[in-house]
Amino acid sequence: MTPLRIGTRGSALATTQTTHVAETLTERSGLAHELVVIRTEGDVTTGSLASLGGTGVFASALRAAVLDGVVDAAVHSLKDLPAAQPETLEIAAVPARADLRDALCARDGLTLATLPEGARVGTGSPRRVAQLKALRPDLELVDIRGNVQTRLARVPGLEQHDDHAPAAAGSPRGDLDAVILA
């Protein structure tokens, strides 16, 4: 039997999430699967997400791969999907929700409350920028791009940012629990 070809972005987090979905499908249906890595505009462009047009920069190549028959299905973070989808595509399943909180990964055990005034916080999310500005208007918020591992690698050396605010859901899937502050 031909394996189900499942499209995924190539980041460690994306392949971990896709592997989880693919293995669950195999367990429940007996279908074999094959992961197919698709490079997206968001993966290869270094500009801010806002300058790239925001939603869809990570999903458009995956959507095209499904429509063109390169893959049979694709797994992607729902938050990055545009609200309007082609009529020929369907969101066929949504896995159980992971941790919905955002996480602060900071040096020396600092928390959002104990960050020094004017601390530099890196995030690529306009939503997180708004939340951080509301809670700590004194912080310097810096646009940051890259996968979770790349962004976290910037924290210990403090070359650019005092800390980083990613989604907590990405952490257990990427084995990053040790750097998340509760």
Region locations from a protein language model:
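Domain-level signature for soluble enzymes in the chorismate/prephenate branch of the shikimate pathway
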Residues: 1-182
